[in-house]
Amino acid sequence: MPGQPTNSRLSEGDFNYESRDVGYTTHRRPDPRIAAQIHASLGEARSVLNVGAGAGSYEPTDRYVVAVEPSASMRSKRPRHLSPAVVGFAESLPFDDGAFDAAMLILTVHQWPDQAAGLREVRRVTRGPIVVLTFDWRAADRFWLAEYSPEHVKVDSSRFPEIDSLAQWLGGHARVEEVPIPLDCTDGVAEAYYGRPERMLDPAVRAAQSVWGFVEPAAISRFTERLGADLASGAWDRRFGHLRTQPEFRGAMRLVIADR
């Protein structure tokens, strides 16, 4: 049921990837420009821990990476050139103190049952930077979706931790970077379609965005009906048509980089 978190620890937290075909390999392919920003934030680290690793998106291939992922479904989607993932959870990592040079947490913290405990545990096993890809929903109104589906924003803003809380849980020393999203972004988060609104009418595209699993069907219908009507009438283009050719979009996506 939409809005109902999973009661199983088969997955990392609030979204059960075992029971849903989310189409990640088709619609959530790592974007090389976002990858470059993430990898640069890892600094000179040679060993990297990837917690809530999913299918391995954005894992660098030129460093030693240990991935941790509880979902069997997501582990099965890891490409062959990546190492198999360790089965585990953020709140209880099976590693010694300071075992890794750096850690990366890619759009995962919002799904953890105990975000504070998980981040403290990641800090325990990491002696260098922790790089968190997340969203700052205080900037949600930059994106037209906030007008077409306020329910989407309400749900996601309740799931994602505040940036200040992230920094505090990671030790208090963090910097925040905006992540520009390119017009042809291959990683199908909602903001990736800022200039391609028709794609958001595709149920398969929305299925690859976990938030829609928590939005009531009636609200989804209102969203698709209104967006579809505005696209057909030209109302969307009259207000937002400039986005169709805008090279990049600076919305709510953020990198939080916490050093020791």
Give each language-model segment a name.
Residues 107-111:
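Short catalytic micro-motifs in class I SAM-dependent methyltransferases
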Residues 104:
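A conserved beta-strand element that flanks and buttresses the S-adenosyl-L-methionine
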Residues 47-93:
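Class I SAM-dependent methyltransferase SAM/SAH-binding core
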Residues 116-130:
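A short glycine-rich, Lys/Arg-flanked "PGG" loop and its adjoining helix->strand segment in the class I
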Residues 45, 100-101, 127:
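Local beta-strand N-terminus motif with an aromatic residue
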Residues 1-46, 57, 72-77, 129-164, 184-191:
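Conserved class I S-adenosyl-L-methionine
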Residues 176-260:
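Conserved Class I S-adenosyl-L-methionine
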